[in-house]
Each structure stands twice: as C-alpha cells, then as structure tokens.
C-alpha cells in the first residue's frame, strides 16, 4: 500500500482502516461509500463493481471502488454471505459546515454473526457463538443479535462443542482461547465458519448468576464484549441470559438430525421434504423460529410435554375458534426483529406501523384464546400483555401512509402536534395566500398580466414586463432586472414567503424530532414486547401442530415408565405426506420390557431405513409435544437418539464411510444410556466382509450387555440372526416379500423372524442391469451358497460366555517381552477416532517397522 503524498482525507481513511484490518472499510464520501487500496481491488471482484483509481495521474494511483449509499445494504449482504466483515464509517458532521476534513467514524462493524439489517431478511435465527475453555470444560454462549436471544451452557468435550455449533447453524464463532490445529481445521475448513477472537470480558453485574460456572461466565462475557464492540451502542433489546443444560433436551448430534431430515432435506438442503416443512403451519416469523427450536430440542420432561399436548388437544376440539386464531395471527409482524431495529436506532415509520398493527391484533387474539375456556390455555392468556398505551401512541402519532424513510416527511399524523399542524397549515394555505396577493395587486395596479413566480435564487417575485414598468406601484421593490422584464417584491409577499420557508424547514426538523421521541418511547417497552413475542410464538406453534394433527389424522401419544415401545400402524410422517396416505404402507413397532434390540434383515429398497426413521420421527414428534402419525403410540421417554443411517464419505476431512461409521458407533456406545435410542443401518459395510461382520456382532453384543439402549440394527449379514439364540434381549424381524413365478414383490411390512434371502440380484434387475450380467451373478451366488454350506466359512458364531477360553482366562496378545511392550505402548498412544486414513496408514507403517 503506497502512502506517499497522502491527502488529509486519505490519511483519515488509513488511520481508521488500521483499526479494522480484518474488515472491508466502507468510507462514506457524500452519496457513496468508497473502498480503497486492497479493499477496493478485492471488493470490485467479489461485488462485480467497477474498479477505478484516485489521483489517476499520480505516480502511484490509489485503487478505488464505490457503491451508492442508498443501495449499500445489498452489497454488504454479499460480503457477509461470503464470510467477510464490513466496517461502516459515516460522516459525523455536515460537509457544508465542516472545517477541513469532514469528521468520520466507524459506527458499526457487521459480521456474519451480527447481521441485523438485510436487503433480503430471513425469518430464521442467525446465531453468533462464543466458546471458552478452562482446561477442563467448555463454556458455550450464543446470541441472535437480531432478536436478542442470549443463552449459555457448558460442555464436556470438543465433540459436544462442534455438535452444538452445527445444531445452531452458526456462521461465526468467537473464541477466547487458542484452538489446536486439528480443531481449527474442523471449524474453518469442514464447517466453513468465520473465527473471531476476544480476550476481554464485558463487565456487567447483571450477568453474574450464582448458577453459572466460571467458564460459562467468561464465554457469555466475551460474547457481550464482542457484540458491544462491533455494534457500538447499548442494545436494550438483549434478553436476560438464559442458562440451559444439554441433558434437559433429547440429545441428537448434527449428523443424526441431518440423517433424519429434521429441518432440511439432506439431499437437497431445502426445507421441503423435512419434518420442519411438514409441521410448519405457523403464521408468524417468530412462530417459525420457535417451531424449528422445538424440533431441534425435543423435551425430556413428561410434565412439559403433556402441557403442550393438552393445549393442542383443546385447539383440535374447537375448529372455528382455532381458525379465527390462525387468521388473527396472520396480522402479527416479527415483534422480536422490530424490537431490535428500535434498539439499534434503525426503526423507520413503516416498522412502527407494523408494530402498531400487531398490537391492534393482540386484543382479538387474547379474546379468542379466552373463548377456549380452558385452564391450560388461560396460562397463555395471562402471559399476553396487550400494551394498549403503546398501540394508542403509534396509532395516533404515525400517519398510516407514512413512507419507509424518515427524511421524506409526512410521517406524523395531523392533530398529534399543534406546532406541526400550524406549519403544515402555512405550507398548505400559503399557495392560496400568494394567489390572493397576486389577484389583489393585479387589480390595484392595472397590470393585467401581473403574476407571481418562484425560483431558488429570488424566491417569490412579481414578474413585470418592460411595457408595464410605468404601472409598478410604489410599494414594489426591485429584486432583479432581465432583458425584457423585471422582478419585484413586496413586504407582504416577503412575509408570506418567510412564513412558508420557515414552515417548510421547521416542519421537517420538528417532524424528525417528534419521530425520534416516539421511537425512544417505544424503546422503553422492549422488554414487554419481547415477552409478548414469546407468548404469541408459542400460541402460533401450538396452533400449527393442531392444524397438522387434524389435517393428517395424527393421534395423541402416551408415555410409560417401563421401557415399552408400542406403535400400532405407525407411519413415517414426512414420507406419507410426500407419497399420499393411500400409497403409504404403515408398520407397527413393538419392544416389550425384555426386548432391547431388533435385528432387522431384508432386501435393499424394501423399507428397512424408513422403518427405522419412522421410529425416530415418532419419538421426536412425541417429545416435542406434537401428535404423531399412528393409530396408537405408547413410548418411554428417551434421553438421546443416535443414528447411522445412509453412507457418505466425509471427503473434506479425509474420512471414509467406514471411518465415519466407526466414529459414530463409538459416540453412540460411549454416550448412550439404557434410556437412549440407537438406530444403525448396515454398519460395517466399508470393510472386508468378515471384518464388517465381526465388528457388527461385537457392537450388537456390547449394546446388549453393557448399554441396554433400545436399538434397531439393520444388516445384510444374515449370519447375525443366530445371535437371537444367545442374546436374550434381541429379536429378529424382517421385511416381508412375496415370491411368485420368479418375481419378487416387496411388501414393505415388517414381520417377525429373520429374512431368508437378501434379494440383491432382484434389486439389480429392477435397476435395469443386463440380463447376461444378472444370469452370471445368479450362478456365482449359487456356487457361493454351496461353498458356505459345505465349509461354513460364513459362519460367525456369537460369543459364548461359557467357552473354554473364558473359563481359562484370555491369553495376552502381547506377551511379556520388551518388543511386545513397546508395540503395546505405541498402540495405546494412538487417537484412533481423530486420525485421517493417511495418518492411519502412516502409523501402521511405523508399527510394522517395530516387528
């Protein structure tokens, strides 16, 4: 960056820029925001705007690019979406009155995690996450600056931190400690996050809570410090810090949520085809956000679940009232976002009108809720604050046709302020007064073509042609002489003109001041508005779930304390919605008190994965308080769901399908309890047949003997069905098929017992493979099955506790010699779960050299 012969204005730019080296600096110059030097070059490319230069004839011209101030937000949005920060430097004084260089200051730093304004607003949350580490546990705080939501928790390990960040769909993570290189790679390269750093803790006594740990306080404090530092103002809309525990909700990793298509379809990354899409009959942006939160965090408290169920049942029983409620909610705007705009000093007249319109709807919503005449609904009614005084203020103060910008005028209603009304009367009637003066002077002077004109230089004046100069009255005074005419004024005309100019200037200034005063008054109601927003959002989600339940004929699930799963004629709610009720084939699912594992076999495409997902979605819907897709459901309360459904290599981190499978299996068996649900689909596919089968059997046995979680394990290893003879809590089920005249029909119904065939060649036939290829595959299969029966090479008997090896004690794999001890130490030092395939190969090579 060349800095020779820098002008005072450019020196000001450089002085400001050095404080924001990691951000694009938008430097306000008149009607444009300008960028210079490297910022200009990079922005021109990213924003597809013209790149020019300042002082083009200089030896080192300065690269320059700019965007109009009135459309700057759309360009800021692009930079933020690409993961950059933007610092906005405004002119702090009127350039016309400035002495020397116009004073400029950065008024806001916009980052991916602190977006409030956007040219394309999104109803979804935008969370900024802060993480701190005390050497033992992690503190994680998050905030949506646009709504004021502010929460904190503590977590045991980095895996939990990563999962929570993914669940929050954060775009920016604020760190108060140094990450390891591997952790940084995960966050930046795999999760595509912007990492920011903050060392200072915001000093705020209101943050101190005896229930918070030190690491939670520092995470929350650094988050607050960063937000105040970037937003550069007091944020009155920030809500009280809420402490939460992961264990208070049904725990699911991001991978689990993704495989179950909870908030978006994993194949399309769109909302359509997800559980969120199915359940969303909300009418407000606040309700949409809350519904997503409920899906993300189902409850584990039976009391809280039943409370939601009860309200949904009340709504279901009153169609007319519920319809009125839904229609009334359509008139509710995003109170949370409107409150934040007020807090940021960015709320315009349209924003206040939306807020006023919302408040006008609240009494109707409250009356409808009261009409349900239900104690559980009355709790919601009692939480609704109508704020009639604020609604009255907005209704009487803001003109219903007010523009979106403050500078255009016509904001304040007539009758709200006497002075403003007077000025408007002067402006409105002034033209009539001038017309009266013109008519009077024309008649008295005898100048038939006498008229009053106006221009910026001379103001209002009488236009008199040269032929009529002899008729000019004595009280006229000359203002200007032209070639064929002269311009005159009078004391009376000057007085009227002065009144009109004063009225125009004072009206504009007064109207602005009145609006600022009203906005300041609205800000004092923010806490009450946020409480109202939460209640209306809850009402919206509950009516949405009632509408979905009625439309799709869902039933109210029951809960038990004896670890029994009973689902009669259950359906995969999303698949049913996509396919249609007539096409979908329901399935019952049953786990008695004794059964902990269902081993499911059957061909591909027969419905095994759908059966597993059906159970998971039923549990999630039930524990979020929703009704479910079945004829009858009775469930235990689960504390976590672990899944491995579907295969996809993690190419970015260099992890294969098999490695990802093993990592997810490890997380499940380490974290699951006997109150958890485990769903494993075809575990062990990514390695050799015997290796995969051995691992699958060992995992099943481990879950059976040590974990005790309710588990569905889908497999193509038919040999594993023999485990039912040894494992007392395992039962076999299979997907039924119908064979007739060489054709196979998949019935998509689950039946007891193991499958007798896998029908893989039939699936290949459906896929359209050549007949000659299928014939050859059938020949090979026949030969392999014959060999298997004769040599029993495929037989992998389950572990038998009474075997001689167990009775005699397991022999040591390593022995007692020094070389074996060295190999053992090397193996124990390996962090298998965090190795890439390349690292694993390298380590194996090094171990081989020790032999």
Curated annotation (Swiss-Prot):
Cellular component terms per the entry's GO annotation: cytosol
Keywords attached to this entry: ATP-binding, DNA damage, DNA repair, DNA-binding, Nucleotide-binding
MF terms in GO: ATP binding; ATP-dependent DNA damage sensor activity; damaged DNA binding; mismatched DNA binding
GO biological process, one term: mismatch repair
Disulphides: none
Alphabetized CDD domains for the sequence: ABC_MutS1 (cd03284)
Superkingdom of origin: Bacteria
Binding site for ATP: 602-609
Its biological purpose: This protein is involved in the repair of mismatches in DNA. It is possible that it carries out the mismatch recognition step. This protein has a weak ATPase activity.
Family in the record: Belongs to the DNA mismatch repair MutS family.
Protein name: DNA mismatch repair protein MutS
Species of provenance: Streptococcus pyogenes serotype M2 (strain MGAS10270)
């Amino acid at each position: 960056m060349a800095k020779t012969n820098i002008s005072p204005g450019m020196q000001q730019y450089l002085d400001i820029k050095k404080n924001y080296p990691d951000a694009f600096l938008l430097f306000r110059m008149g009607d444009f925001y300008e960028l210079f030097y490297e910022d200009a070059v990079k922005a021109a490319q990213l924003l597809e705007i013209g790149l020019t230069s300042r002082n083009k004839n200089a030896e080192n011209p300065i690269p320059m690019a700019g965007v109009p101030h009135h459309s700057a937000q759309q360009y800021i949005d692009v930079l933020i979406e690409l993961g950059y920060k933007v610092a906005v430097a405004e002119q702090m004084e009127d350039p016309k009155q400035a002495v020397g260089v116009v004073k400029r200051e950065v008024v806001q730093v916009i980052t991916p995690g602190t977006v409030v304004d956007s040219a394309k607003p999104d109803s979804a949350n935008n969370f900024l996450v802060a993480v701190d580490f005390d050497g033992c546990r992690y503190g994680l705080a998050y905030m949506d600056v646009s709504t004021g939501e502010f929460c904190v928790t503590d977590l045991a390990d980095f895996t939990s931190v990563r999962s929570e960040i993914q669940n929050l769909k954060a775009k920016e993570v604020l760190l108060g400690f140094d990450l390891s290189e591997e952790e940084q790679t995960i966050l930046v390269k795999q999760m595509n996050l912007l990492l920011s750093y903050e060392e200072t803790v915001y000093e705020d006594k209101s943050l101190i809570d005896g229930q918070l740990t030190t690491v939670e306080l520092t995470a929350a404090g650094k988050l607050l410090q960063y937000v105040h530092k970037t937003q550069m103002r007091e944020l009155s809309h920030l809500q009280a810090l809420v402490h939460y525990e992961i264990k208070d909700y049904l725990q699911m990793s991001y991978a689990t949520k993704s495989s179950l298509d909870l908030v978006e379809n994993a194949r399309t990354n769109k909302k359509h085809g997800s559980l969120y899409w199915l359940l969303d009959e909300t009418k407000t942006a606040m309700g949409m956000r809350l519904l997503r939160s409920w899906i993300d965090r189902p409850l584990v408290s039976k009391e809280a679940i039943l409370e939601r169920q009860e309200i949904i049942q009340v709504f279901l029983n009153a169609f007319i009232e519920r319809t009125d409620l839904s229609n009334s909610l359509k008139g509710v705007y995003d109170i949370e976002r409107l409150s934040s705009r007020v807090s940021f000093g960015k709320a315009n007249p349209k924003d206040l009108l939306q807020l006023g319109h919302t408040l006008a709807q609240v009494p109707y919503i409250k009356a409808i809720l009261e009409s349900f005449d239900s104690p559980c609904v009355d709790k919601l009614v009692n939480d609704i604050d109508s704020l009639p005084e604020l609604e009255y203020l907005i209704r009487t103060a803001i003109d219903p046709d007010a523009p979106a910008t403050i500078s255009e005028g016509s904001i304040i209603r007539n009758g709200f302020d006497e002075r403003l009304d007077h000025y408007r009367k002067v402006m409105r009637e002034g033209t009539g007064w001038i017309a009266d003066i013109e008519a009077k002077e024309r008649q008295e002077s005898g100048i038939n073509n006498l008229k009053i004109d106006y221009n910026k230089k001379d103001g209002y004046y009488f236009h008199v042609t040269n032929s009529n100069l002899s008729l000019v009255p004595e009280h006229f005074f000359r203002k200007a002489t032209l070639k064929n005419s002269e311009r005159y004024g009078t004391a009376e005309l000057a007085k009227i003109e002065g009144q009109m100019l004063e009225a125009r200037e004072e009206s504009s200034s007064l109207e602005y001041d009145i609006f600022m005063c009203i906005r300041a008054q609205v800000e004092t109601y923010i806490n009450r508005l946020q409480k109202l927003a939460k209640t209306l959002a809850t009402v919206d989600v509950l009516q949405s779930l009632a509408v979905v339940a009625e439309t799709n004929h869902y039933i109210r699930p029951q809960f038990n304390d004896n670890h029994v799963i009973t689902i009669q004629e259950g359906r995969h709610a999303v698949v049913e919605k996509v396919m249609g009720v007539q096409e979908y084939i329901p399935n019952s699912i049953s786990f008695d008190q004794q059964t902990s594992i269902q081993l499911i076999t059957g061909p591909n495409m027969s419905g095994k994965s759908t059966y597993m997902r059906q159970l998971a979605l039923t549990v999630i819907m039930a524990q979020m308080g929703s009704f479910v897709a079945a004829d009858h459901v009775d469930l235990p309360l689960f504390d976590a769901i672990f899944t491995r459904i579907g295969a996809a290599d993690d190419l970015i981190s260099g992890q294969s399908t098999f490695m990802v499978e093993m990592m997810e299996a490890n997380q499940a068996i380490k974290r699951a309890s006997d109150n958890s649900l485990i769903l494993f689909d075809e575990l062990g596919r990514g390695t050799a047949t015997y290796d995969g089968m051995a691992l699958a059997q060992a995992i099943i046995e481990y879950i059976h003997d040590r974990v005790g979680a309710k588990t569905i394990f889908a497999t193509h290893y038919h040999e594993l069905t023999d485990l039912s003879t040894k494992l007392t809590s395992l039962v076999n089920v299979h997907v039924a098929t119908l064979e007739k005249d060489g054709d196979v029909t998949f019935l998509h119904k689950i039946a007891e017992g193991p499958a007798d065939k896998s029908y893989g060649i039939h699936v290949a036939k459906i896929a359209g493979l050549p007949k000659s290829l299928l014939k050859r595959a059938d020949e090979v299969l026949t030969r392999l099955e014959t060999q298997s029966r004769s040599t029993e090479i495929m037989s992998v008997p389950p572990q038998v506790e009474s075997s001689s090896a167990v009775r005699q004690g397991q022999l040591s794999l390593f022995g007692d010699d020094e070389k074996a001890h060295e190999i053992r130490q090397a193996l124990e030092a390996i962090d298998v779960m965090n190795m890439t395939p390349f690292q694993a190969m390298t380590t194996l090579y090094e171990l081989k050299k020790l032999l």
